């Protein structure tokens, strides 16, 4: 995690930027329509809750990877109950601390569900957080909603589920993956994006070099037939991950050269280091600015 001195150093840079719409899913005013698609035997992808949710059903209950936004928790619970062999939820994984992943924590925590997360995710959920670049505030979760089982490196829930730490700093500093070997499905949260540019949450440990490292980790866990479920957007292939790794690797190299030459975030944006990807990915300015700031955060941890 970042120390307070780093936050003081970076706060001015973040506050000076123009607030832009966050790439995280926006709150919906009315009850969402939860969609369901089968990924494999007893494995389903639920969409529309604020982020992708993976559900494994079975005689011993349901395992969820992520829980959508809090305002969609009831609708998601109804959709899960309607799945074949639905049953009660017994385990929830939080792939990281963002509200699109942790919105069902309180509802399920009150029901006695085991909530698993990487230890850094639990620590972030115990405190109030304000993003300095746009002022967005996140309240700490109630005790009952916080992960009640954490790990540092990796673990096994049962023979059909393995999980592990993606990287010490990727999208955040607490990203995890959940792998279903029998179906060859890998859920990775926002360590990979299915659409648009990712959020580089340097305030809670993410950085552009870590995004590259996280994709390398995902590729090492997967194989060429693996289906990869990102935090948002459609299911990805091994080839998609390789393409993302190439793209973010190129951008990281260019930004690293700029910061070593003393460029500012605005100069980095103006240099258009992601120009060849804009037609497919959209306007990268916010992503480039956050990525450049993340280099400051990572390279100057005690500034």
Predicted regions and their residues:
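Divalent metal-coordination and catalytic microenvironments
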Residues: 42, 56, 66, 96, ...
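Active-site HxH/HxHxD metal-binding segment of metal-dependent hydrolases
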Residues: 81-154
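C-terminal segment of N-terminal export signals and the immediately downstream linker at the start
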Residues: 21-47
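Short catalytic-loop micro-motif centered on adjacent basic/acidic residues
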Residues: 63-66, 91-94, 162-163
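N-terminal secretory signal peptides and thylakoid transit peptides that target proteins
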Residues: 1-17
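Metallo-beta-lactamase
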Residues: 61-62, 69-71, 166-250, 254-257
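Accessory terminal helices/loops
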Residues: 2, 17, 21-26, 220-227, ...
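Conserved beta-strand hairpin/beta-sheet module of binuclear metal-dependent hydrolase folds
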Residues: 37-87, 177-190
